[in-house]
């Protein structure tokens, strides 16, 4: 764990084995840049990292005056430093003008600290020869790199303490999600997922209810049960319900997550290459667990319910089949034409369960469609729903948090593609196009009229698990949805 220590001193007077200097917007003339000639000799142009070994200074470029690039560069700095022999590093306080607003200083500090904290993460549980990082401490000298505008009116020390608290909570929450999503399916079963949720509940004094297949049968959650049929004897399903109840709650929010601990496609079997990484199909449910940890520790004034449908989707003699017709908890019949469109079946029943709680807002998270990745790329999540104001709020607050999001629109023509001749709805579209939206429209079939304007669907299929380093994310799971939804909840409560 990397410790960040705040010190009321100048950057020059702070003591550490190494100095970290960000070159913002190719500004090589700043007083903290000690050897401009050396940088020119090696043609360092303010991008990537460069180590001045003699002066023990690591220079890291921030391409533009942008808080998100500052976060990314801070992460790159720690990734570079963990390969070196320094135990401690010092850094000043940087502010970027792009997002200069009333809380500009706070947002810049959050970005700096979160980038630093996330830089050490690596999923190495199964590596026998782990390389422990020597880097243990970052000394933050509470001196501004440049003059801060009047929008940075709060005291530097107060803002730094608040930002550090946020970064520590968010790092812990993201890493809970990352570890869970990265866990291989031989370990990361529905029961294991429930155990992780129980640990989070115990630490945060949350209510938790873990329900088995008997409960699902009682509640007539037949769509959920169908997906688990092939795994029932070995890895039975779990409906996990976490509850955070503060003394004062302005809103009741339900967060619903798809928790497919492994998805081979069922009888509509995936090609072998497509099965690899399907441990990540629990990304939505894992995000909900991480969110409960974050929101509870931040002490948000909302009653938050986290609902996770955890199951496998496998093959076997008992597996559900194409041509089956399922009767969901909501009472609607579903024609199954593809067993690999299973996440939406689990979510349909979980969303029905969530609506029974009468929440003010419902947000579901799922690695739902490959079509979303094709349309938006692997770094961007999709937002769907009916309420434009709610969608816009999630998008703007999510983007400010550093996640990439884009809205996808429902339309009546795509809705026709999930019609069935023999049931209320079909679980797969009759067209190969618009698959991310038709999946969202399928879920819409299970949202009651009174909740249509209270519901958002977030497809995190792209960024939940990426097989390379990007932004502040290491190879594998990213914790997609956690930062965005935390920011969304905070903004939602400001309007309450």
From Swiss-Prot:
Kindly identify the residues recorded as the active site.
Answer: 270, 344
Query: Taking the first listed entry, what is the main subcellular location of this protein, grouped into a coarse class?
Result: cytoplasm
InterPro entries xrefs:
Leucine_aapep/pepB (IPR011356), Macro_dom-like (IPR043472), Peptidase_M17_C (IPR000819), Peptidase_M17_leu_NH2_pept (IPR023042), Peptidase_M17_N (IPR008283)
Q: Does the keyword Hydrolase apply?
A: yes
So which cofactors does this thing need? Mn(2+)
Task: Extract the CDD domains matched here.
Answer: Peptidase_M17
Q: Which GO terms describe its cellular component?
A: cytoplasm
Q: Which GO terms describe its biological process?
A: proteolysis
Q: Which domain of life is it from?
A: Bacteria
Q: What is its EC number?
A: 3.4.11.1, 3.4.11.10
Cofactor: how and how many bound = Binds 2 manganese ions per subunit.
Catalytic activity from the UniProt record: Release of an N-terminal amino acid, Xaa-|-Yaa-, in which Xaa is preferably Leu, but may be other amino acids including Pro although not Arg or Lys, and Yaa may be Pro. Amino acid amides and methyl esters are also readily hydrolyzed, but rates on arylamides are exceedingly low; Release of an N-terminal amino acid, preferentially leucine, but not glutamic or aspartic acids
Q: Which keywords has UniProt assigned to this entry?
A: Aminopeptidase, Cytoplasm, Hydrolase, Manganese, Metal-binding, Protease
- Asked if Protease is a keyword of the record, the answer is yes
Transmembrane residue ranges: none
The task this protein performs is described as: Presumably involved in the processing and regular turnover of intracellular proteins. Catalyzes the removal of unsubstituted N-terminal amino acids from various peptides.
State the similarity comment.
Belongs to the peptidase M17 family.
What is the name attached to this protein's record?
A: Cytosol aminopeptidase
Question: Whose protein is this, by species?
Answer: Helicobacter pylori (strain J99 / ATCC 700824) (Campylobacter pylori J99)
